[in-house]
Protein backbone atom coordinates (compact mmCIF):
# COMPACT_ATOMS: atom_id res chain seq x y z
CA UNK A 1 0.00 0.00 0.00
CA UNK A 2 1.65 3.25 -1.17
CA UNK A 3 -0.08 6.54 -0.48
CA UNK A 4 0.89 10.01 0.64
CA UNK A 5 0.80 9.87 4.43
CA UNK A 6 -1.34 12.63 6.02
CA UNK A 7 0.31 14.60 8.82
CA UNK A 8 -2.20 13.58 11.48
CA UNK A 9 -0.93 9.98 11.26
CA UNK A 10 2.18 11.10 13.12
CA UNK A 11 0.38 13.07 15.85
CA UNK A 12 -0.89 11.39 19.02
CA UNK A 13 -3.92 13.66 19.32
CA UNK A 14 -6.04 14.45 16.28
CA UNK A 15 -9.72 15.02 15.58
CA UNK A 16 -9.40 13.15 12.28
CA UNK A 17 -8.07 10.08 14.07
CA UNK A 18 -11.15 10.11 16.29
CA UNK A 19 -13.46 10.72 13.32
CA UNK A 20 -12.02 7.82 11.29
CA UNK A 21 -11.83 5.37 14.20
CA UNK A 22 -14.99 3.36 13.24
CA UNK A 23 -13.63 2.73 9.73
CA UNK A 24 -10.28 1.80 11.27
CA UNK A 25 -11.86 -0.81 13.51
CA UNK A 26 -13.54 -2.46 10.53
CA UNK A 27 -10.39 -2.34 8.44
CA UNK A 28 -8.36 -3.73 11.34
CA UNK A 29 -10.80 -6.61 11.87
CA UNK A 30 -10.64 -7.80 8.26
CA UNK A 31 -6.88 -7.23 7.97
CA UNK A 32 -6.36 -9.48 11.00
CA UNK A 33 -8.42 -12.20 9.34
CA UNK A 34 -6.27 -11.91 6.20
CA UNK A 35 -3.12 -12.45 8.24
CA UNK A 36 -4.57 -15.62 9.72
CA UNK A 37 -4.96 -17.44 6.41
CA UNK A 38 -2.61 -20.20 5.26
CA UNK A 39 -0.32 -18.99 2.44
CA UNK A 40 0.88 -21.14 -0.49
CA UNK A 41 4.33 -22.69 -0.05
CA UNK A 42 7.23 -22.72 -2.51
CA UNK A 43 10.21 -25.07 -2.20
CA UNK A 44 12.73 -22.23 -1.91
CA UNK A 45 13.89 -20.27 1.15
CA UNK A 46 11.87 -17.05 1.53
CA UNK A 47 12.88 -13.92 3.45
CA UNK A 48 10.18 -11.25 3.69
CA UNK A 49 11.36 -7.67 4.25
CA UNK A 50 8.30 -5.63 5.11
CA UNK A 51 7.04 -2.87 7.39
CA UNK A 52 4.27 -2.19 9.88
CA UNK A 53 3.00 1.01 8.30
CA UNK A 54 1.99 2.67 5.05
CA UNK A 55 4.64 4.98 3.61
CA UNK A 56 8.42 4.91 3.32
CA UNK A 57 10.64 3.27 5.94
CA UNK A 58 13.89 2.63 4.06
CA UNK A 59 12.87 -0.89 3.07
CA UNK A 60 14.18 -0.84 -0.52
CA UNK A 61 17.87 -0.26 0.38
CA UNK A 62 17.56 -3.08 2.94
CA UNK A 63 16.37 -5.48 0.22
CA UNK A 64 19.29 -4.37 -1.96
CA UNK A 65 21.73 -4.97 0.92
CA UNK A 66 20.45 -8.53 1.36
CA UNK A 67 20.62 -9.19 -2.39
CA UNK A 68 24.27 -8.12 -2.46
CA UNK A 69 25.25 -10.32 0.49
CA UNK A 70 23.25 -13.25 -0.88
CA UNK A 71 25.27 -13.11 -4.10
CA UNK A 72 28.51 -12.93 -2.11
CA UNK A 73 27.45 -16.13 -0.34
CA UNK A 74 26.89 -17.88 -3.67
CA UNK A 75 23.11 -17.62 -3.90
CA UNK A 76 21.11 -16.51 -6.92
CA UNK A 77 18.58 -14.20 -5.25
CA UNK A 78 15.27 -13.29 -6.80
CA UNK A 79 13.06 -10.45 -5.58
CA UNK A 80 9.28 -10.71 -5.52
CA UNK A 81 7.72 -7.25 -5.84
CA UNK A 82 4.18 -5.96 -6.20
CA UNK A 83 5.44 -3.46 -8.78
CA UNK A 84 3.66 -0.45 -7.25
CA UNK A 85 3.04 2.25 -9.81
CA UNK A 86 3.60 -0.08 -12.77
CA UNK A 87 1.10 -1.00 -15.47
CA UNK A 88 2.13 -4.57 -16.37
CA UNK A 89 -0.36 -7.34 -15.70
CA UNK A 90 0.21 -10.93 -14.69
CA UNK A 91 3.73 -12.09 -13.84
CA UNK A 92 6.51 -10.03 -15.39
CA UNK A 93 10.28 -10.53 -15.14
CA UNK A 94 11.84 -7.07 -14.99
CA UNK A 95 14.33 -6.12 -17.70
CA UNK A 96 16.09 -2.92 -16.66
CA UNK A 97 17.22 -2.26 -20.25
CA UNK A 98 13.74 -2.23 -21.74
CA UNK A 99 11.24 -1.72 -18.92
CA UNK A 100 10.40 1.72 -17.55
CA UNK A 101 9.00 2.82 -14.20
CA UNK A 102 5.60 3.16 -15.88
CA UNK A 103 5.80 -0.54 -16.75
CA UNK A 104 7.02 -2.08 -13.51
CA UNK A 105 7.32 0.70 -10.90
CA UNK A 106 10.36 2.60 -9.67
CA UNK A 107 11.30 0.22 -6.85
CA UNK A 108 11.35 -2.83 -9.12
CA UNK A 109 13.74 -1.07 -11.52
CA UNK A 110 16.09 -0.13 -8.68
CA UNK A 111 16.04 -3.69 -7.37
CA UNK A 112 16.66 -5.13 -10.85
CA UNK A 113 20.12 -3.55 -10.79
CA UNK A 114 21.06 -6.08 -8.10
CA UNK A 115 18.95 -9.23 -8.62
CA UNK A 116 16.31 -10.92 -10.73
CA UNK A 117 12.95 -9.24 -10.04
CA UNK A 118 9.48 -10.57 -10.80
CA UNK A 119 6.50 -8.26 -10.34
CA UNK A 120 2.98 -9.51 -9.80
CA UNK A 121 -0.01 -9.17 -7.50
CA UNK A 122 0.29 -12.96 -7.18
CA UNK A 123 3.46 -13.32 -5.14
CA UNK A 124 3.46 -17.12 -5.31
CA UNK A 125 3.33 -17.02 -9.12
CA UNK A 126 6.14 -14.44 -9.13
CA UNK A 127 8.28 -16.70 -6.92
CA UNK A 128 7.64 -19.63 -9.27
CA UNK A 129 8.79 -17.49 -12.20
CA UNK A 130 12.01 -16.64 -10.39
CA UNK A 131 12.59 -20.32 -9.65
CA UNK A 132 12.40 -21.04 -13.40
CA UNK A 133 15.10 -18.39 -13.92
CA UNK A 134 17.42 -20.35 -11.62
CA UNK A 135 16.95 -18.34 -8.42
CA UNK A 136 17.51 -20.35 -5.24
CA UNK A 137 16.58 -17.69 -2.68
CA UNK A 138 13.49 -15.47 -2.60
CA UNK A 139 13.59 -11.97 -1.12
CA UNK A 140 10.04 -10.71 -0.78
CA UNK A 141 9.81 -6.92 -0.95
CA UNK A 142 6.78 -6.16 1.23
CA UNK A 143 3.78 -8.50 1.33
CA UNK A 144 3.99 -9.36 5.03
CA UNK A 145 0.34 -8.50 5.71
CA UNK A 146 -1.11 -10.05 2.54
CA UNK A 147 0.08 -13.60 3.36
CA UNK A 148 0.19 -14.62 -0.31
CA UNK A 149 3.43 -16.59 0.00
CA UNK A 150 4.85 -18.66 2.85
CA UNK A 151 7.78 -16.90 4.56
CA UNK A 152 10.59 -18.67 6.39
CA UNK A 153 11.56 -15.44 8.11
CA UNK A 154 10.00 -11.99 8.40
CA UNK A 155 12.05 -8.86 9.07
CA UNK A 156 10.01 -5.68 9.54
CA UNK A 157 11.66 -2.30 8.98
CA UNK A 158 10.80 0.73 11.14
CA UNK A 159 11.82 4.34 10.53
CA UNK A 160 13.01 5.65 13.91
CA UNK A 161 11.80 9.18 13.09
CA UNK A 162 8.21 8.06 12.57
CA UNK A 163 7.97 4.89 14.63
CA UNK A 164 4.43 3.50 14.63
CA UNK A 165 2.89 6.96 14.20
CA UNK A 166 -0.24 7.58 16.26
CA UNK A 167 -0.67 3.83 16.80
CA UNK A 168 -3.95 3.67 14.87
CA UNK A 169 -4.86 1.44 11.95
CA UNK A 170 -5.52 2.81 8.45
CA UNK A 171 -7.21 5.18 7.66
CA UNK A 172 -7.08 6.72 11.16
CA UNK A 173 -3.35 6.01 11.33
CA UNK A 174 -0.47 4.47 9.38
CA UNK A 175 -0.67 0.88 10.67
CA UNK A 176 -1.67 -1.71 8.09
CA UNK A 177 -2.83 -4.18 10.74
CA UNK A 178 -3.17 -3.79 14.54
CA UNK A 179 0.27 -3.95 16.17
CA UNK A 180 -0.57 -6.91 18.40
CA UNK A 181 -1.39 -9.06 15.37
CA UNK A 182 1.69 -7.96 13.45
CA UNK A 183 3.90 -8.65 16.46
CA UNK A 184 2.58 -12.22 16.66
CA UNK A 185 3.53 -13.01 13.03
CA UNK A 186 6.88 -11.20 12.71
CA UNK A 187 10.30 -12.68 13.54
CA UNK A 188 12.38 -9.56 14.19
CA UNK A 189 12.55 -5.79 13.64
CA UNK A 190 15.15 -3.55 12.00
CA UNK A 191 15.06 -0.01 13.41
CA UNK A 192 16.63 2.55 11.09
CA UNK A 193 17.91 5.92 12.31
CA UNK A 194 17.78 8.04 15.47
CA UNK A 195 14.91 9.94 17.09
CA UNK A 196 12.72 10.20 20.18
CA UNK A 197 10.26 7.72 18.65
CA UNK A 198 13.03 5.12 18.72
CA UNK A 199 12.71 4.63 22.50
CA UNK A 200 8.99 3.89 22.22
CA UNK A 201 9.60 1.38 19.42
CA UNK A 202 12.39 -0.28 21.41
CA UNK A 203 10.13 -0.58 24.46
CA UNK A 204 7.25 -2.14 22.50
CA UNK A 205 9.50 -4.60 20.67
CA UNK A 206 11.25 -5.58 23.92
CA UNK A 207 7.86 -6.58 25.35
CA UNK A 208 7.38 -9.05 22.48
CA UNK A 209 10.61 -10.86 23.34
CA UNK A 210 11.64 -10.78 19.68
CA UNK A 211 14.99 -9.47 18.37
CA UNK A 212 15.50 -5.78 17.61
CA UNK A 213 18.32 -4.87 15.21
CA UNK A 214 19.60 -1.40 14.35
CA UNK A 215 20.91 0.35 11.27
CA UNK A 216 21.47 3.79 9.78
CA UNK A 217 21.07 5.14 6.25
CA UNK A 218 24.18 6.65 4.68
CA UNK A 219 23.48 9.19 1.96
CA UNK A 220 25.52 9.38 -1.22
CA UNK A 221 25.18 11.59 -4.27
CA UNK A 222 26.05 11.57 -7.97
CA UNK A 223 28.18 14.73 -7.57
CA UNK A 224 29.84 16.90 -4.92
CA UNK A 225 27.27 18.32 -2.49
CA UNK A 226 29.16 20.26 0.20
CA UNK A 227 28.64 24.02 0.04
CA UNK A 228 26.00 23.91 -2.71
CA UNK A 229 22.50 25.35 -2.35
CA UNK A 230 19.60 23.20 -3.53
CA UNK A 231 16.04 23.17 -4.71
CA UNK A 232 15.10 19.65 -3.60
CA UNK A 233 12.05 17.77 -4.86
CA UNK A 234 10.73 14.27 -4.26
CA UNK A 235 7.72 12.02 -4.69
CA UNK A 236 8.50 9.35 -2.09
CA UNK A 237 6.96 8.03 1.11
CA UNK A 238 9.12 10.08 3.49
CA UNK A 239 10.60 13.13 1.70
CA UNK A 240 11.79 14.76 4.95
CA UNK A 241 14.37 12.01 5.33
CA UNK A 242 15.71 12.85 1.85
CA UNK A 243 15.92 16.57 2.61
CA UNK A 244 17.82 15.76 5.80
CA UNK A 245 20.30 13.60 3.85
CA UNK A 246 21.30 16.64 1.77
CA UNK A 247 22.14 18.51 4.97
CA UNK A 248 24.13 15.52 6.24
CA UNK A 249 26.35 15.84 3.17
CA UNK A 250 26.85 19.56 3.99
CA UNK A 251 24.46 20.84 1.34
CA UNK A 252 22.07 23.76 1.91
CA UNK A 253 18.38 23.11 1.25
CA UNK A 254 16.80 26.40 0.19
CA UNK A 255 13.51 25.24 -1.35
CA UNK A 256 11.62 21.94 -1.15
CA UNK A 257 8.79 20.52 -3.26
CA UNK A 258 6.96 17.32 -2.38
CA UNK A 259 4.75 15.17 -4.60
CA UNK A 260 2.67 12.02 -3.95
CA UNK A 261 4.56 8.75 -3.51
CA UNK A 262 5.50 7.18 -6.88
CA UNK A 263 4.51 10.37 -8.71
CA UNK A 264 5.28 10.54 -12.44
CA UNK A 265 6.66 13.99 -13.23
CA UNK A 266 5.43 15.78 -16.33
CA UNK A 267 7.43 18.01 -18.65
CA UNK A 268 5.51 20.93 -17.15
CA UNK A 269 6.58 19.94 -13.61
CA UNK A 270 10.24 19.71 -14.58
CA UNK A 271 10.22 22.96 -16.57
CA UNK A 272 8.77 24.78 -13.56
CA UNK A 273 11.37 23.29 -11.19
CA UNK A 274 14.24 24.14 -13.55
CA UNK A 275 13.03 27.74 -13.92
CA UNK A 276 12.74 28.21 -10.14
CA UNK A 277 16.22 26.77 -9.60
CA UNK A 278 17.71 29.04 -12.27
CA UNK A 279 15.92 32.08 -10.84
CA UNK A 280 17.67 31.65 -7.47
CA UNK A 281 20.88 30.08 -8.80
CA UNK A 282 20.19 26.74 -7.10
CA UNK A 283 21.18 23.17 -7.91
CA UNK A 284 18.38 20.65 -8.34
CA UNK A 285 18.30 17.59 -6.06
CA UNK A 286 16.13 14.48 -6.16
CA UNK A 287 16.21 10.82 -5.14
CA UNK A 288 17.26 7.77 -7.15
CA UNK A 289 13.64 6.57 -7.13
CA UNK A 290 12.40 9.88 -8.50
CA UNK A 291 15.13 9.97 -11.13
CA UNK A 292 14.07 6.57 -12.45
CA UNK A 293 10.58 7.97 -12.98
CA UNK A 294 11.94 11.15 -14.57
CA UNK A 295 13.71 8.98 -17.13
CA UNK A 296 10.33 7.92 -18.53
CA UNK A 297 10.28 11.41 -20.09
CA UNK A 298 12.50 12.08 -23.10
CA UNK A 299 15.99 13.31 -22.24
CA UNK A 300 16.13 16.93 -21.08
CA UNK A 301 19.34 18.89 -21.47
CA UNK A 302 18.25 21.47 -18.87
CA UNK A 303 18.70 18.90 -16.07
CA UNK A 304 22.49 19.04 -16.19
CA UNK A 305 22.51 20.73 -12.76
CA UNK A 306 20.53 17.87 -11.20
CA UNK A 307 22.23 15.84 -8.47
CA UNK A 308 20.72 12.43 -7.66
CA UNK A 309 20.80 11.15 -4.07
CA UNK A 310 20.71 7.53 -2.97
CA UNK A 311 21.25 5.71 0.33
CA UNK A 312 23.11 2.66 1.61
CA UNK A 313 22.28 0.78 4.79
CA UNK A 314 24.91 0.73 7.53
CA UNK A 315 24.01 -2.10 9.93
CA UNK A 316 25.21 -1.76 13.52
CA UNK A 317 25.92 -5.50 13.47
CA UNK A 318 28.22 -5.66 10.45
CA UNK A 319 27.51 -9.31 9.56
CA UNK A 320 23.77 -8.89 10.11
CA UNK A 321 22.69 -9.85 6.57
CA UNK A 322 24.87 -12.96 6.51
CA UNK A 323 23.64 -14.16 9.90
CA UNK A 324 19.99 -13.58 9.03
CA UNK A 325 20.33 -15.37 5.68
CA UNK A 326 21.89 -18.33 7.48
CA UNK A 327 18.85 -18.42 9.77
CA UNK A 328 16.53 -18.33 6.75
CA UNK A 329 18.34 -21.29 5.19
CA UNK A 330 18.25 -23.22 8.47
CA UNK A 331 14.50 -22.73 8.75
CA UNK A 332 13.98 -23.69 5.11
CA UNK A 333 15.94 -26.92 5.54
CA UNK A 334 13.97 -27.74 8.66
CA UNK A 335 10.60 -27.34 6.95
CA UNK A 336 11.84 -29.28 3.91
CA UNK A 337 12.92 -32.12 6.18
CA UNK A 338 9.61 -32.07 8.05
CA UNK A 339 7.72 -32.17 4.75
CA UNK A 340 9.81 -35.11 3.49
CA UNK A 341 9.31 -37.02 6.74
CA UNK A 342 5.56 -36.40 6.70
CA UNK A 343 5.37 -37.49 3.06
CA UNK A 344 7.32 -40.65 3.84
CA UNK A 345 4.99 -41.58 6.67
CA UNK A 346 2.03 -40.96 4.40
Curated annotation (Swiss-Prot):
Its EC number is 2.7.1.130. Keywords: ATP-binding, Kinase, Lipid A biosynthesis, Lipid biosynthesis, Lipid metabolism, Nucleotide-binding, Transferase. It catalyses: a lipid A disaccharide + ATP = a lipid IVA + ADP + H(+). One of its GO terms (biological process) is lipopolysaccharide core region biosynthetic process. One of its GO terms (molecular function) is ATP binding. InterPro entries: LpxK, P-loop_NTPase. ATP binds at residues 53-60. One of its GO terms (cellular component) is plasma membrane. Pfam families: LpxK. It is an enzyme of class 2 (transferase). The keyword Lipid biosynthesis applies. HAMAP family: LpxK. Belongs to the LpxK family. Transfers the gamma-phosphate of ATP to the 4'-position of a tetraacyldisaccharide 1-phosphate intermediate (termed DS-1-P) to form tetraacyldisaccharide 1,4'-bis-phosphate (lipid IVA). This is Tetraacyldisaccharide 4'-kinase. The gene is lpxK.
